[in-house]
Amino acid sequence: MDSNFIFGIGAFTAIVLVLAVVILIAKSKLVDSGDITISINDDPSKAITLPAGGKLLGALASKGIFVSSACGGGGSCGQCRVKVKSGGGEILPTELSHISKKEAKEGWRLSCQVNVKSSMDVELPEEVFGVKKWECTVISNDNKATFIKELKLAIPEGEEVPFRAGGYIQIEAEPHTVAYKDFDIPEEYHEDWDKFNLWRYVSKVDEHIIRAYSMASYPEEKGIIMLNVRIATPPPRNPNVPPGQMSSYIWSLKPGDKVTISGPFGEFFAKDTDAEMVFIGGGAGMAPMRSHIFDQLKRLHSKRKISFWYGARSKREMFYVEDFDQLQAENPNFTWHVALSDPLPEDNWDGYTGFIHNVLYENYLKNHEAPEDCEYYMCGPPVMNAAVIKMLEDLGVEHENILLDDFGG
């Protein structure tokens, strides 16, 4: 046999062996294996040990430590921020839209993006350790508007969710398939569903998902959690976009069904001051508005001046009307106002019309002695939020007095 041929085979074999060794070494460095320890808040009693692999958000959850993640770990909400002191690797490009360069230098990361490859040292907010999971039972799931349901859940007997008004919970769903044609929707709301043929949609989810929803209930409504959930249907101009996964799941729920939630979470809390409170809402942004206003007037018996400005398309989209009318009758410091952007002829509407930010300005803030001294709490569709914020900035309101809940619209 030719010596050059034999030499070539030998050289090739040697190269393959060297590459195999390099790959094995790299694998030992880069690929998850073995158990690792996550030290938490410099407290040995809080440290957890678990197999390497996955993301930090999931690793913590597997040990009963639930960090807020409105998007369910997709990296889009920026809520799951933790400080990683060591062991987290370099910050990823997907995190930089939520974390500034200064924060990155301080160790802030999105826990849903941090790979658990080696032992690490992290710092978590203390309130995280008060977060729990509950398996709840659906009490009711009724339409309050064309695209909004009120989901009412019973907490297990003897348990309570120690939340503050304006807080939120996370709701979970296992893989499932939901057909819109099976939704229970009263006849009065069928017009738009028929118009856009929404009954044709099917939501198929192949993985476990988590989403956040603001609570409509307030702390003295014991034993229940109440949500206002807007169905995320595909936009009319792009009907082939998949429908919202979690909202479709929630709309399919029926009394007696079991639902897993975790919480409480939140930062959209009322300030403890005597300043006037102006609440501005639209759509499913009603949820935290109801929670806050009921808490102020029914639990705290607040004497602060409070007004609520809510935007809807037509009378069919108005809800909790009797509740707010009663609060207004019982509390001289509270008024509430609705503006319809597209009232129907049969509405016979003689109230405010137009967009809520314009109505609020023209009919109240324009002639207010000191709008910059009020506190503004808002939750609604992104377009509404942006319009209200610009209007308030033009009036000289400082950012610290503009409080926004991004979840409810």
Swiss-Prot record:
Mode of membrane association: Single-pass membrane protein
Domain 2Fe-2S ferredoxin-type: 34-128
SUPFAM superfamilies: 2Fe-2S ferredoxin-like (SSF54292), Ferredoxin reductase-like, C-terminal NADP-linked domain (SSF52343), Riboflavin synthase domain-like (SSF63380)
MF annotations from Gene Ontology: 2 iron, 2 sulfur cluster binding; electron transfer activity; metal ion binding; oxidoreductase activity, acting on NAD(P)H, quinone or similar compound as acceptor
Alphabetical UniProt keywords: 2Fe-2S, Cell inner membrane, Cell membrane, FAD, Flavoprotein, Ion transport, Iron, Iron-sulfur, Membrane, Metal-binding, NAD, Sodium, Sodium transport, Translocase, Transmembrane, Transmembrane helix, Transport, Ubiquinone
GO process terms (BP): sodium ion transport
Binding-site residues, [2Fe-2S] cluster: 71, 77, 80, 112
UniProt xrefs under PROSITE patterns: 2FE2S_FER_2, FAD_FR
InterPro entries in alphabetical order: 2Fe-2S_ferredoxin-like_sf (IPR036010), 2Fe-2S_ferredoxin-type (IPR001041), Beta-grasp_dom_sf (IPR012675), Cbr1-like_FAD-bd_dom (IPR008333), FAD-bd_FR_type (IPR017927), FNR_nucleotide-bd (IPR039261), NqrF (IPR010205), OxRdtase_FAD/NAD-bd (IPR001433)
EC number: 7.2.1.1
Catalytic activity line of the entry: a ubiquinone + n Na(+)(in) + NADH + H(+) = a ubiquinol + n Na(+)(out) + NAD(+)
One Pfam family linked to the record: NAD_binding_1
HAMAP family (UniProt xref): NqrF (MF_00430)
NCBIfam families registered for this protein in UniProt: nqrF
Protein name in UniProt: Na(+)-translocating NADH-quinone reductase subunit F
Record organism: Actinobacillus succinogenes (strain ATCC 55618 / DSM 22257 / CCUG 43843 / 130Z)
